[in-house]
């Protein structure tokens, strides 16, 4: 190589660097094809170093070569777009291959291939129909704005600058990508010009042009679709597509599923059918209440035996005992009078009303005592109950029946031992609990009194009481049954014990069931005001009370619920109720 050739070689190399900014070979060959050593690019004659260099570096158009003058300064003729089988974006030689390192190997590797990709995007690579990347895709114009690209950009040589921005390649059935990238088979991409996108949304099929094209995964019901509503195919995953069952815009559910709910809605809205349905519902509610009462009776009978109906109770004070002397003392005690005073203070009832309420409790006590006298087999029943309690218990079970003391304030059973009872009396929990329970009884007493007076049968009794007649006197058998039922209702308010009193009384209670439910509903109101949680807490424990000073409030709650509902149906006509409500 003489001085002139050496000078030409260095000049060509410098010129190449100035034009291209890169000093490495780009591809499988410039003008001559895949191999640069055989001189296919020359037009004849002996190859000189100048021609070799010019051909090798794509500088024929600068050094006077005739073949490459039609190409721009930044690109040589590139036959790669028409070639197939190889990776089209890979050069003919690796960066470390010896053939490439002959000329420019010392300069290679300084620039990344992303520069080449940026040049290739303007070079008409897609004009041959075999491109892997659209020249102007929506991702290049507005990257990250609408990422609805198909698999044409999933290639590792796409325009994504970071691997983290590249969506994961998915199969033909995943995330709605088409089975084959359309741009690979010659179809053109109209993303940049507002045409239908070939990219993937998060739903199935093509994105559509904002409502003009429906996605194949959506089933549109044209028969039931309203005329004034336009169907908009919104982007969303399959979960969202199945979500709107009653939205007006485009039903995404199957036709039979859509038609059935519409019929149901139309039937429910028809005024002619609402009345019978309401009647049926009311009947069901009444039956449910009575069934609930029966279950409560059975539950109480299982827990406490049939004798629990023979207990004497005071509905206002939640007092419960099996001894007549105890109830007599209670009705004459100061605690009972304090409760009545509290009721009068809160409700502002007249003295006549308070006397009537007291007489109601006395009448209940008398009725219970009469029932006990009529029960001849009470002792036998108790023995049978005792046998049932210990049924199935063997010596190996190490169980025995003992007496216990029930504390309604704490809802605790205490062994009937002096030491245990004294220890509980001095415990801080009992000291706090008895104060809270006392306040609770006062609150519930007001609600119980109001619910009793809301009972229409009790109102009739009160009218007779005001006239000076005996309100509890039995005039007719039917009236007597109603009265007994009412009294039982009152007792139910306090405890469902009296609901279960006798089979005859249960029948009477069913006849007067609505009245009983009214009282029960009223007591439920009490529970709601005071907090049903508290009432329930007092509930079962109170009913079980062996020592028998407090009635169970738990059963009262259920009765109160029924009474509340009945009370709503029957407004309070009782003249004394108005001050209560105020």
Swiss-Prot record:
The modification N6-acetyllysine is found at residue 247. One of its GO terms (biological process) is regulation of DNA-templated transcription elongation. Residues 154-194, 243-302, 472-582 are annotated as: Disordered. Residues 272-290 have a biased composition (Basic and acidic residues). Keywords: Acetylation, Activator, DNA-binding, Isopeptide bond, Metal-binding, Methylation, mRNA processing, mRNA splicing, Nucleus, Phosphoprotein, Repeat, Transcription, Transcription regulation, Ubl conjugation, Zinc, Zinc-finger. The modification Phosphothreonine is found at residue 251. This is DBIRD complex subunit ZNF326. The gene is ZNF326.
